[in-house]
Every structure is written in C-alpha cells, then in structure tokens.
Amino acid sequence: MRAVRLHEHGGPEVLRQDEVPIPEPGPGEVLVRVHAVGVNPPDWYLRDGMSNLPPETRPKFTLPVIPGTDMSGVVETVAPDVDGFSAGDEVFGLLRFPGFDGGTYAEYVTAPASDLALKPAGIDHVHAAGAPMASLTAWQFLIELGHDHPSPFQAARHRPVALGPGTRVLVNGAAGGVGHFALQLAKWHGAHVTAVASGGHEPFLRELGADEFIDYTRNRPEESVRDLDLVLDAVGGSGSRRFLRTLKRGGALFPVFFGEFDDEETARLGVTVSGTQVRSNGAQLAELGRLLDDGTLRVAIDSTFVLADARAAHERAARGHIRGKIVLTVAQA
C-alpha cells in the first residue's frame, strides 16, 4: 500500500510517500481502507521531532513512522474478538491518541475498535475525517471529559463548566478546527458566544452562531470584554494569560495548548485555569456523529490535498489562518 512516512525530522519536505505492507489487525482491532485523513497539529509536531514539547512529555517513537491520527474509511476486516463493526461499515475515528502511532497517512490502517464510530450517513468521508480530533477536543474540554487519565499539564482533573442560557463564553481562535467546534457546542447548550478571529472569518463564524465577533487584528479581545464565565482559548500557550482579566470571579480559562500561569494570580482573581489532553473515545465520537448527522454541528473544510501531496498540506497549515480543517484524500482503486 501507499503511505506517507517520516524518515527524519524537519519541515514539510521530509514527508515522503513509500510502498509498505498492509498492516494486520491485532486483537480488538479492525482494518480500515482509508478514504480521507484529517491533518492536525500533532502531525507537524511529530514531523519536527516534538521540539515544542518539554522533553518529559514527549512520547516515544522510532523512525520511519507514518504520521496521522484522524481518518474516515471503510472496514475491510475485523479481529475475531471485535463486536459492533463488520466489513463494509463506514467508520471514522481518532486513533490511539495521545500516542503518535495512529498511522493514518496511508491507504490502510489498523484501528482499535474502541476508537471508532460509524460515519454519519449525512456527511462524506472528507468531512468525517476532519472531525475526530478537533471535535473530541472541544467535547472533552466543554461537555464531558470521559476518562480518568491524568493530564501531563496539571495535577487536578479537568472539569467542564456547565453551559446554558446566560453563560457568557469567548472562543479564541474560533475559525480553526477546535475553535469552530467549540463555538457550535457552546451554542448547542444555549450559551452567548463571542468569537475571536481575523476579520475575514466573521461571516463564517456568524453563520455558525456567534453572537458577537472580535477581529483581533483591530481590537484586543482582552480589552474588549469583561465578566465572562468561560474562555476557551484554542490558540493557547503563553498568550492565554491575557484572558484572565476578561473573566468574572468564578470564571474559567481553558487553554487548549497549556501555558504557564501564576497560581497566586488566579487565586486572587478567583478564577480557574484548566486543561486536558484529548484522548481517543469512540463512544463520545458516536455522540458527535449524531450531531453531525442531524446538522447541529458542521465540519468546515479549509482545503483538501491528495495523500501524495501531504507536504503541500503541511505547507498550507504553516501559513495559518485556517478555516476549519485541512484534509488529505486517498484515491480508491
């Protein structure tokens, strides 16, 4: 089969298409013929050798490696101990995350059955492949954590904030993968949502349900709003601290990419800073699939590239200002 692999770390140019054997499913797994692959930040973290992560949190892996965690496709075979899936089923999933051995940049992939859900009938493989990591991240931050695994970023267990009418939420990076799902999930629960993105994304985010919009290229969001119940910062990192001043006492800041925070400052302000690491979860993905199927949620596609052009997809990601998701398509013989 064809697969894109990393033989060394570096820029997009190190992504190389190879011929490799079709993998064999082990216990609890299915073999999936891949139709489309979602491109996610961990793909380029892996490509560049995890240089953005502290050494103690870097997962272990050996080269060559097939990157990728998100996919949508059709079940080819199932292991004898697998119930719930059969050959011919259309499925989608976030595979083996937070490990980095999903291996979805390929024509075939083995997948733990527990990581999969049936693909919503109302969307195609491209849109389904764009959903798993981003939608599960938004779900586990905002709706239900769904596991008891400790976070590498904090000692306390992450607890979502109750959302409902009257809850004031700001989503930073609202046009991106996680951000556009977070906006929609908050609106699904009746929250009042302010979306932060560059100005060209305003019509798109208004269409998704944003009540207010801040163009960060013209106005500083941390100076534009106050008394928020929750900030979901899909950009995260060191810049998240600026949002502390936007929260009311009892409010919460959820940075998707964790940064450094002063415990004394958050205690003085009476706010909570919390995050988690998304994990594969087929049951939660099935719930998200129902929302995708009935139109409550939609997947925005920024651009598509064929599998052999994975390098171009990573180059597109590096340019930023992504609206929704980048997806690789896999030709079917």
Predicted regions and their residues:
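Glycine-rich beta-strand-centered segment in the early N-terminal region that forms part
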Residues: P21-G38, S51-F97
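A structural motif shared across PLP-dependent enzymes of the aminotransferase-like
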Residues: P98-A113
